[in-house]
Amino acid sequence: MTDCEYKHTPTDLHRVTSIAFSMGAQELVACATPHIPSAKVDQPYKAGREYAINRSNPRWEQMKPVWLQAVRSMVMLRQGKAAPDVLVFLGDDVPVKTITSRLPDGIDGLDWDVCTGDALKHRLQVKGGRLVTPDGIEYKAFLMVDKAHVNAESQARIDAFREAGVAILHSGESIIRPLEILTHHESVVHTHRRIDNTEIFYLANLEDRTTVVSFRLQDMPKKVRVWHNLSGSRHELKCHNDRTYTLTLHPCESVFFTYSPNAL
């Protein structure tokens, strides 16, 4: 948030927070000051700008909805556990830092983590055809990066995963998405968490206009409850005959919706 300058609008800040939350962030820090910054010719701002957001800025009142949504989102996104769909294997010869250009095709619209050979040896077990970590995170599939270096020990572990029923995928292959955005997918971002038998999805509209989103849920639940972050209002979504749902998102609005797959 400290990379946002005074010229940035509430919409800009909302996009920053929403994309961060969709990528797994659970906490954001905003530096604020009550003083009006005053740059001088011989004493310019460091890095060419003031590092803190000025509370005397005339746009401060306009920013309040952004902070309110961000705080409520942070509280919700700390509940339960992350529910990633696939685990991306980068190889045995790469740093833990993810290089975007090396990510495989097929992960768009999915929640994912990355790993190297160390995780294969020390962090992953198979349960019911899924990869499971010691802290209870489950992955539906294991996706290998093209041309990844795989040593003999890691290859043996991957072969064992396959024999145990884990879906081993390669670049371009994918799985059925738990949440499939059918319309305006370029305008929204989302992430998925789980509390016991309850699925929690965060969905945010990045646009400064009202967006009507149509989506499909793999579990096809009978009841989907929606909580609007800013207004606090709650309601249920009805499933259409084609097994899709429709949700209207106001400009720069984020929501959470929940359901229990086995609920009657």
Give the predicted meaning of each segment.
Residues 1-264:
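Carbohydrate-binding surfaces of carbohydrate-active enzymes
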